[in-house]
C-alpha cells in the first residue's frame, strides 16, 4: 500500500513537472536565450526588482499573521513566528510538489506548537475560500472594465466568448447540481462501509470547525486588513517589476491588474509555482497590450524566475530558523 501510494504521488509530481515543462518548451522552442542574458545585464533596472522584494516578503507575513488570528477562536495557540515561518516554508515546498504547502504548514504547527492538524487545515480551507472569492470578485470587476482586451484575447486564442456562455443553461446547472449531490451521497455511503469512516468524520468535523472560525474571529477588521494587505502586497510585488523593463514601464496599473489577475487564475493549473500556465497567460495578455513577443517572453521568464528564487530564499530562511526552534514542550526538533 505504501509503495502504491509512493508511486501515485511520484506520478502526480512527474506529470505536474512535465506539464509545466511542455508548456515552457512550446513557448520558448524558437527563443534566443541570449536576449535574456543581455536583458539581465544591460536591459533592465534592477532597482525596481529589489524594491518589489519587500512586498513579496510582506505578503507572506500578512498571511502568517492572518492565520495566527484565525486559529485563536478555535482554541489553538501558535507562536506568531512559527506561523510566519510555516508560510515561508510551505511556499517553498510547493515548488517541488504543487499544493503540498497547505498540508506542510499545518504539519509544522502540529510539530512545533501542538496545534490540531484538522483544525489548522480547516482554517487553511477557510482562508483559501475567502482568497478565491476575493480574486474572483476582482477578476469580474477587471473583466468588465477591460472587456475590450479580453474580447481580443478570446479572438486571438481562437475561442468565441459568446459560444462559451451559450453552453450554460438552467437545465445544465440543474443536472450538474444533481450529479454533484449524487456523488456526495455515494461517497458518504461508501465511507460508512469502511473502518476509516470515523477518522474521516473526525477530520471533516475539525475542518468544519476551522472554517467556522471566521465567525468568531476576535478582530474581524484586522482579518480584513490582513487580507487586503496580502493581495495588495502580492500586486505591488508584481506591479513594480513593470518598471524594470522599458517594454512594460509605460503600460500602467490597469494592464498590471489584468495580467496579475489572469496570472493568479492560471496558477490553478497544478505546476510548480504555476510555471508554464502563468508564463503563457501573462505573456499573451502583455502582447494584447502591445508588448512585443520577445519582450513579453523575456518579462515572464525573468520575473517568474526571480520571484521563485525569493520564495526559495524565504523557505531556506524558515527551515534554518525552525531547525533552532524549540517546541512548546521545550524540546528542540
Question: Where are the regions that the model predicts?
Answer:
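Predominantly cytoplasmic-facing regulatory/coupling regions of multi-pass membrane proteins
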Residues: 1-88, 145, 151-267, 306-333
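Alpha-helical transmembrane segments and their lipid-water interface positions
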Residues: 55, 63, 67, 94-105, ...
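Extended non-transmembrane interhelical loops and adjacent amphipathic helices
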Residues: 72, 85-114
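Membrane-interface alpha-helices at helix entry/exit sites of multi-pass transporters
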Residues: 80-83, 102, 115-127, 136, ...
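Transmembrane alpha-helix interface/packing and boundary motifs in multi-pass membrane proteins
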Residues: 89-98, 258-279
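Alpha-helical transmembrane segments of multi-pass membrane proteins
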Residues: 89-90, 94, 122-134, 226, ...
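Interfacial segments of multi-pass membrane proteins
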Residues: 109-116, 210, 280-298
Amino acid at each position: 500500500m505504501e509503495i502504491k501510494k509512493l508511486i501515485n504521488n511520484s506520478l502526480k509530481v512527474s506529470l505536474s513537472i512535465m506539464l509545466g515543462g511542455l508548456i515552457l518548451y512550446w513557448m520558448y522552442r524558437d527563443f534566443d536565450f541570449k536576449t535574456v542574458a543581455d536583458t539581465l545585464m544591460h536591459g533592465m533596472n534592477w532597482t525596481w526588482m529589489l524594491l518589489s522584494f519587500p512586498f513579496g516578503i510582506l505578503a507572506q507575513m500578512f498571511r502568517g499573521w492572518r492565520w495566527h488570528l484565525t486559529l485563536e477562536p478555535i482554541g489553538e495557540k501558535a507562536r506568531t513566528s512559527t506561523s510566519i515561518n510555516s508560510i515561508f516554508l510551505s511556499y517553498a515546498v510547493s515548488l517541488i510538489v504543487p499544493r503540498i504547502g497547505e498540508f506542510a504548514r499545518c504539519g509544522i504547527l502540529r510539530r512545533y506548537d501542538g496545534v490540531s492538524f484538522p483544525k489548522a487545515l480547516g482554517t487553511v480551507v477557510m482562508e483559501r475560500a475567502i482568497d478565491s472569492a476575493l480574486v474572483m470578485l476582482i477578476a469580474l470587476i477587471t473583466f468588465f472594465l477591460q472587456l475590450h482586451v479580453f474580447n481580443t484575447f478570446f479572438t486571438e486564442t481562437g475561442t468565441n466568448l459568446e459560444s462559451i456562455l451559450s453552453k450554460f443553461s438552467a437545465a445544465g446547472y440543474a443536472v450538474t447540481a444533481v450529479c454533484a449531490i449524487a456523488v456526495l451521497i455515494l461517497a458518504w455511503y461508501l465511507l460508512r462501509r469502511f473502518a476509516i469512516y470515523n477518522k474521516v468524520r473526525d477530520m471533516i468535523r475539525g475542518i468544519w470547525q476551522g472554517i467556522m472560525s471566521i465567525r468568531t474571529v476576535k478582530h474581524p477588521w484586522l482579518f480584513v486588513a490582513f487580507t487586503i494587505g496580502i493581495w495588495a502586497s502580492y500586486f505591488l510585488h508584481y506591479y513594480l517589476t513593470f518598471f524594470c523593463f522599458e517594454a512594460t514601464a509605460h503600460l500602467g496599473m490597469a494592464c498590471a491588474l489584468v495580467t496579475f489577475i489572469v496570472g493568479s487564475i492560471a496558477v490553478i493549473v497544478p505546476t510548480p509555482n504555476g510555471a508554464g500556465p502563468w508564463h503563457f497567460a501573462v505573456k499573451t495578455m502583455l502582447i494584447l497590450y502591445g508588448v512585443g513577443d520577445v519582450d513579453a517572453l523575456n518579462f515572464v521568464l525573468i520575473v517568474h524566475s526571480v520571484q521563485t528564487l525569493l520564495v526559495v530564499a524565504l523557505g531556506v530562511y524558515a527551515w534554518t530558523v525552525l531547525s533552532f526552534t524549540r517546541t512548546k514542550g521545550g524540546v528542540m526538533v
